[in-house]
A protein has these predicted regions:
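Autoinhibitory propeptides
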Residues: 4, 73-170, 184-187, 191, ...
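Low-complexity, acidic Ser/Thr/Pro-rich repeat tracts that form intrinsically disordered stalk/linker regions
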Residues: 5-48
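Short glycine-/aliphatic-rich beta-strand segments at the starts of folded cytosolic domains
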Residues: 50-59
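Solvent-exposed loop/turn segments at secondary-structure junctions
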Residues: 60-63, 93-94, 104-106, 122-126, ...
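Subtilisin-like serine protease catalytic core
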Residues: 66, 159-282, 294-297, 325-326
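Structural detector of well-ordered beta-strand residues that form the stable sheet scaffold
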Residues: 119, 267, 330-332
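Hydrophobic, small-residue-rich alpha-helical packing segments that form membrane-like cores
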Residues: 286-292
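Catalytic-core segments of hydrolase enzymes
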Residues: 296-335
């Protein structure tokens, strides 16, 4: 909720708007200040010899094997005896790799023919604690009779007045994981699910990192931990509750805890490390890459990233979002 402006102030200029996939370097946060989102580290901030994760995007026409061979030559040219090891491959929403290589080889990798972009991986911190002093926040009035623990998202958003309750729809929550045994998800699905155990099993061979993802229930037809590379997508730590919170608002379906679309299914893509809660770019991109195969109707990304496309990392995400849009998937990314 934005704080009111004094009456004498002039209205702000209209926000810039660009098509999905284009890059707008002028975007700022809602306060008008540049976001403090972690930027991709630069080579002068990291020991050049330190082996780090480098995310690489290839041109669409590039040959994957030939490009990797050229990248290895480039790395060895800067650090003799070293090579780039493939950690992950992307081939659906993005054509590229996540590689482990010396940080100081970044510029050499960028110069390889067929490489369109490359950056040192970021790790986004997760903080689930908000205060009244947070950007744009003000205290909302509360009636004495209100029980905030039992407020329905449907009533808050007037979604209870709609006849559609998410029937036949699939929402992917790419977040810190979801506590799928939480009572908020204990209701009965009242419509024929779009994803069944059989259909998910049929899609699995086409998936990238999530090949061993699991079908949990009609409510949760697919779950995978892309950060730790295992099928346990349950959250860890206090900040890990964020994904469960988001999923409950989105599609909770039990008693007084009702989400906006209670009959929708939820794909759980955990992208936060269990060890420290950080969200690495390589895991997030792997989850997004698999969504081209799983084809949810909507992806929810509430990770606090800025929409300001001001570096190679964010430009790469713009490419991914455009690919998902072309696949018929709506991406809702909160800044």
């Amino acid at each position: 909720i934005a704080a009111p402006r004094p009456a004498e102030s002039s209205p702000p200029p209209p926000a810039s708007s660009v098509p999905v996939g284009d890059v707008d370097t002028a975007l700022t946060s809602k306060s008008g200040q540049n976001s403090q989102e972690p930027q991709a580290p630069t080579t002068d901030q990291v020991d050049p010899a330190a082996v780090v994760t480098i995310v690489v995007q290839l041109d669409e026409a590039a040959d994957r094997a030939a490009s990797l061979a050229s990248i290895n030559e480039a790395v060895a040219g800067v650090f003799p005896g070293s090579s780039a090891q493939v950690e992950r491959e992307y081939d659906k929403a993005l054509k590229g790799f996540a590689l482990s290589a010396p940080a100081g080889s970044l510029d050499a990798i960028r110069a390889v023919s067929g490489v369109s972009a490359a950056f040192l991986e970021r790790e986004i911190p997760v903080n689930d604690t908000a205060t009244l002093n947070d950007e744009g926040g003000i205290e909302a009035p509360r009636l004495a009779s209100q029980n905030p623990d039992n407020l329905s998202a449907q009533l808050i958003m007037h979604a209870d007045q709609l006849t559609q309750k998410g029937e036949g729809k699939v929402i992917a929550v790419i977040d810190t994981g979801v506590e799928m045994t939480h009572p908020a998800f204990s209701g009965t699905m009242r419509s024929t699910p779009a994803l069944t155990a059989e259909s998910v099993a049929a899609l699995a061979p086409r998936l990238g990192a999530g090949k061993t993802g699991v079908y949990v229930s009609e409510k949760f037809p697919f779950a995978y931990d892309y950060a730790d590379n295992d099928p346990d997508a349950s959250p860890t730590g206090e900040a890990g509750s964020h994904g469960t919170h988001v999923a409950g608002i989105t599609a909770g379906n039990a008693g007084e805890i009702v989400g906006i679309a209670p009959d929708a299914q939820i794909i759980v893509a955990k992208v936060a490390r269990s060890s420290n809660g950080g969200i690495p770019d390589s895991a997030l991109l792997a989850a997004l890459d698999d969504m081209v195969v799983l084809r949810p109707d909507v992806i929810n990304l509430s990770l606090g990233q800025t929409g300001g496309m001001d570096n190679e990392a964010d430009s790469m995400y713009a490419t991914v979002f455009k690919s998902l849009q072309q696949a018929g998937v709506t991406v809702n990314a909160a800044a």
